[in-house]
Amino acid sequence: MTENRRMKKVNAMLRESIAKVILKDVKHPKISNRWITITRVSLSRDLQSARVYVSIMPHENSQEETLAALKASAGFIACQASKDVVLKYFPDLNFYMEDIFSPQDHIESLLLKIAEQDKKLTHNNNNSSELHD
């Protein structure tokens, strides 16, 4: 139980530190000025590697390009984050996309379709009532 609690604490510290590094220190053009959220970090049991799950707000550059830039900058990000989170061995960072924006976009498009259908039905009902008058 204590190991689980310790692991959660280390994951949270890594998440916060990696987010700070990406926000303040990374100068890659496909990373800086992007809305990147570190949704969670999952450290391996041997503490040698960490899965870093990110959510990237859609932008003119594709999310895949931004993810590729994060992967390319993983060494730099780990080096900078290791100054903040002191561990015996700092884990290798592996970035993965966690798409939290798609469900919202999908719901928004469904609502727009419903609104369009409602307009059509209202328009058709108005036309049919005019014919009967």
Swiss-Prot record:
<dbReference type="InterPro" id="IPR023799">
    <property type="entry name" value="RbfA_dom_sf"/>
</dbReference>
<keyword id="KW-0963">Cytoplasm</keyword>
<protein>
    <recommendedName>
        <fullName>Ribosome-binding factor A</fullName>
    </recommendedName>
</protein>
<comment type="similarity">
    <text>Belongs to the RbfA family.</text>
</comment>
<dbReference type="InterPro" id="IPR000238">
    <property type="entry name" value="RbfA"/>
</dbReference>
<dbReference type="GO" id="GO:0030490">
    <property type="term" value="P:maturation of SSU-rRNA"/>
</dbReference>
<dbReference type="GO" id="GO:0043024">
    <property type="term" value="F:ribosomal small subunit binding"/>
</dbReference>
<comment type="function">
    <text>One of several proteins that assist in the late maturation steps of the functional core of the 30S ribosomal subunit. Associates with free 30S ribosomal subunits (but not with 30S subunits that are part of 70S ribosomes or polysomes). Required for efficient processing of 16S rRNA. May interact with the 5'-terminal helix region of 16S rRNA.</text>
</comment>
<dbReference type="GO" id="GO:0005829">
    <property type="term" value="C:cytosol"/>
</dbReference>
<keyword id="KW-0690">Ribosome biogenesis</keyword>
<comment type="subunit">
    <text>Monomer. Binds 30S ribosomal subunits, but not 50S ribosomal subunits or 70S ribosomes.</text>
</comment>
<dbReference type="Pfam" id="PF02033">
    <property type="entry name" value="RBFA"/>
</dbReference>
<dbReference type="InterPro" id="IPR015946">
    <property type="entry name" value="KH_dom-like_a/b"/>
</dbReference>
